[in-house]
């Protein structure tokens, strides 16, 4: 065997013949084939099955409608906010009753559900008549006001109750175009004017009811100040002091002094204390808030709340202030439930919760029974004695009832002096009322004044 190496030559460009080699199939070709078959099968099913096609169409249609509905709702809300305006009036607001009265008088309203309001009207001669007003009840109502349509919706809550009067809370909502929102002011001003006309020239008396002030009876005709005859200088002195107080609010504020003024009228019963306060309220065009400290279930907290939430332009009247706490202690065992303390009254008069710009009048027949704490300045700033009739008052009262009867007046005054007794102005008025147009008969009956309990 030769050791000479064998030299093998090959062509680098030659391609090997692999025809005899078996190559395994790849997966890609098979997967593509399966997908094509499934796609064809599903496509045929969707195109050939009418139920499937209809369901898909409905789904697409429903989705489109839902999107459209959502868009419409959002667009309508935006449009509502831009074009519509609402005004809500709650039943606890003063304007609520005013608005219902205005609605009752409005001629151009469309209402199918009505409620009735009953009003008592007291005439100057003392007679009382009844007037019924039909107002819109709960529900929707349309009115046309100054060319604009207004929707009025009155709602009554079934779950919320006003504990003060036991009635459900109510709201009235007025809806109109935004461009007409100025009509709300016009409506409220008209309603206010109608309400104020019922009290024009009259004095409104308020009394406490639960935690709030309520009108007591019908507004009373104003009593003229000249109709109350006190001793010389008393009436004028109080009136000057009140006017001075009312015009110096800034002076009080600049000096950090509470803007309050307290008056005490003391003297025997029937001397004209309460009558003067009524006449003063008429002179000032003020109302009167009467607070009975002996009221059942009155507490210190309620007292503070009432005195801090008085109606505007009102005089606070505390009558028989000396008897309030005595009565409570004397009748406590018999079921009297007032729990106002003396310190509670003092805090209500001058505490941090007391109202500013307050005129308070207190009356008493026994000033000696009052505690010194209540007599201090800041609680009582002006004290005046209102006593029985003096010769000055007897003369003035006689001439008021019998103008021009000067000679008989002198005889009457002298006859009263000769009785050597104290006579109240209430007794004199009773005598004069009994003899309205008969001054001579009044003179003859002077002796009846000896009996203070005489009924004319």
Curated annotation (Swiss-Prot):
Gene3D superfamilies: P-loop containing nucleotide triphosphate hydrolases. A motif (Mitochondrial-targeting signal) lies at residues 69-83. GO terms for molecular function: ATP binding; ATP hydrolysis activity; ATPase-coupled transmembrane transporter activity; protein transmembrane transporter activity. It comes from the Eukaryota. It is a single-pass membrane protein. GO terms for cellular component: cytosol; mitochondrial inner membrane; mitochondrial intermembrane space; mitochondrion. Residues 1-44 are mitochondrial intermembrane. Its main location: mitochondrion. Changing residue 273 to A: Abolished ATPase activity; impaired assembly of the mitochondrial respiratory chain complex III. It is found in: Mitochondrion inner membrane. Residues 69-456 are mitochondrial matrix. The keyword Mitochondrion applies. The chain crosses the membrane at residues 45-68. Present with 1990 molecules/cell in log phase SD medium. Belongs to the AAA ATPase family. BCS1 subfamily. Chaperone necessary for the incorporation of Rieske iron-sulfur protein RIP1 into the mitochondrial respiratory chain complex III. This is Mitochondrial chaperone BCS1.
């Amino acid at each position: 065997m030769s050791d000479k190496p064998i030299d093998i030559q090959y062509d680098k460009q030659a391609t090997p013949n692999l025809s005899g080699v078996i190559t395994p199939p790849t997966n890609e070709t098979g997967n593509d084939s399966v997908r094509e078959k499934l796609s064809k099968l599903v496509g045929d099913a969707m195109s050939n099955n009418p139920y499937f096609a209809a369901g898909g169409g409905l789904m697409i249609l429903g989705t489109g409608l839902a999107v459209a509905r959502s868009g419409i709702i959002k667009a309508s809300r935006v449009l509502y906010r831009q074009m519509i305006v609402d005004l809500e009036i709650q039943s606890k607001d003063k304007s609520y009753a005013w608005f219902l009265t205005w609605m009752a008088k409005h001629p151009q309203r469309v209402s199918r559900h009505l409620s009735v309001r009953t009003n008592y009207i007291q005439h100057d001669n003392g007679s009382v008549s009844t007037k019924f007003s039909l107002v819109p009840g709960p529900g929707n109502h349309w009115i046309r006001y100054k060319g604009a349509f207004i929707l009025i919706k009155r709602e009554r809550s079934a779950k919320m109750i006003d504990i003060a009067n036991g009635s459900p809370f109510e709201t009235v909502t007025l809806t109109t175009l935004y461009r007409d929102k100025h009509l709300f002011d016009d409506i409220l001003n008209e309603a206010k004017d109608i309400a104020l006309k019922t009290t024009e020239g009259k004095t409104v008396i308020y009394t406490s009811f639960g935690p709030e002030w309520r009108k007591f009876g019908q507004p009373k005709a104003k009593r003229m100040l000249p109709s109350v005859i006190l001793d010389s200088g008393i009436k004028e002195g109080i009136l000057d002091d009140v006017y001075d107080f009312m015009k110096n609010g800034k002076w009080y504020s600049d000096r950090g002094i509470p803007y309050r003024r307290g008056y005490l009228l003391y003297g025997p019963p029937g001397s004209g204390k309460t009558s003067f306060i009524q006449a003063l309220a008429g002179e000032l065009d003020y109302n009167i808030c009467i607070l009975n400290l002996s009221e059942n279930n009155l507490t210190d907290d309620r007292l503070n709340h009432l005195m801090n939430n008085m109606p505007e332009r009102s005089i606070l009247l505390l009558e028989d202030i000396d008897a309030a706490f005595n009565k409570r202690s004397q009748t406590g065992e018999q079921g009297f439930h007032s729990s106002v303390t003396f310190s509670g009254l003092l805090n209500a008069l001058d505490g941090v919760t007391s109202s500013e710009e307050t005129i308070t009048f207190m009356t008493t027949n026994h000033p000696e029974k009052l505690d010194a704490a209540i007599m201090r300045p800041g609680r009582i700033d002006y004290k005046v004695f209102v006593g029985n009739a003096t010769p000055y008052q007897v003369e003035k009262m006689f001439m008021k009832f019998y103008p021009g009867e000067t000679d008989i007046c002198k005889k009457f005054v002298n006859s009263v002096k000769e009785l050597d007794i104290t006579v109240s102005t209430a007794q004199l008025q009773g005598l004069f009322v009994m003899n309205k147009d008969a001054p001579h008969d009044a003179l003859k009956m002077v002796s009846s004044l000896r009996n203070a309990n005489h009924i004319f």
